[in-house]
Amino acid sequence: MPDPVIAAAKPSLVKLEGGRAYFWCACGKSARQPFCDGSHKGTGIEPLRFTAPRTEETLLCACKRTKSPPFCDGSHNALQGGYRTDAESGAETPIIDRDGDHHPTSWLDGGCFVRTLDPARALRRGALALTPAITAKDGAGLLSVFEARLMKGASDSFAFPDADIVAFVTRGAPAFHVNGERCETKPETGVLILNGESLRLENPHEDEAVVFLTVCPARTEPLWNPKGEIRQDAPRRRAFGVDPALREPMADRFYQVLNGPENGSREITQFIGEIPQSRAEPHQHLYEEAIVILSGEGFMRTQTKRAAVAPGDVIFLPRKQVHALECASPEGMRLMGAFYPAGSPALNY
């Protein structure tokens, strides 16, 4: 059987009607991509009939290399020229400086922004300083991000009602007490706290601990010392650290999922990303995303603007916003990303 033709280097964004049957072009020759128009006749490659499980927007494979037909699985990222571009290529766009009387922020196209957090804006409660980094006030509709800084000691118990949390430790080794269950961590550990569970942070060390909390759905502030019914599940693994054996390639980039549907995070996917000195092709996602830069410097680019990024900066990407993250550091860049709805970080169009 001949190999299918690559119809396009990126997947097709389509809106499917729940319960309706479709025929996905598997040969790559259809003029009605990503659907069949009969051009497969004589190729030996038959179209795939499938029924949409629900009415939704989704990405159907156009490179015909997916391992999950008809849906995109990110295989197009491995095509030559499918993702990476030279960091020095292309016309330069204006650099937007930080401004504002809130956290210093660079506002880019479509509501995308890069933010450097101002510690003076933190909400202080005992040993804990909690800073809202991304909330609905910034245009986020699906998730919020908070930076938690903890001196030696323990915080009060808190929760975000009717929301899941994925936490990420960037500094120190704080202990997480989730419904009273203790969970030890270290830098670059992701921790899952589900809807209905309460959280208390403890820092037994002299040095400050720093944790980023991604909350979904979006919330503006926590509920302190929550009362009433607390979710009680059997003890389970909550903390997931970096494991080189679990890295997934995405062209010249890599990622590792820390929390996602596979381990019970039904709403949010949290991942570690590694970027060499390069610039991504402009692309979009069907999810709303928050990014924290861990190391390396570069630029976040949108259609007509760009902003410098450095360790500690927070980036907000609205759903469907065209963007490209560039690493300018020879040693590369590391980042933590979290997005809703949960899925694969490799899916882009």
Regions found by a protein language model. Name each.
Residues 1-34, 39-60, 85:
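N-terminal pre-ligand scaffold of iron-sulfur
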Residues 26, 147-151, 159-176, 217, ...:
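Short, conserved beta-strand element in jelly-roll/cupin
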Residues 52-74, 95-104:
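Short Fe-S-cluster ligation motifs
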Residues 91-142, 220-267, 348:
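A short, N-terminal "cap"/entry segment at the start of jelly-roll beta-barrel domains
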Residues 127-134, 144-161, 255-259, 269-285, ...:
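Conserved short histidine dyad/triad with adjacent acidic residue
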Residues 139-141, 195-222, 310-313, 319-345:
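Ligand-binding loop in jelly-roll beta-barrel domains
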Residues 156-158, 176-177, 185, 193, ...:
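Short beta-strand His + acidic residue motifs that chelate non-heme Fe in jelly-roll/DSBH
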Residues 166, 180-196, 304-319:
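Short acidic-glycine-tyrosine-enriched beta hairpin
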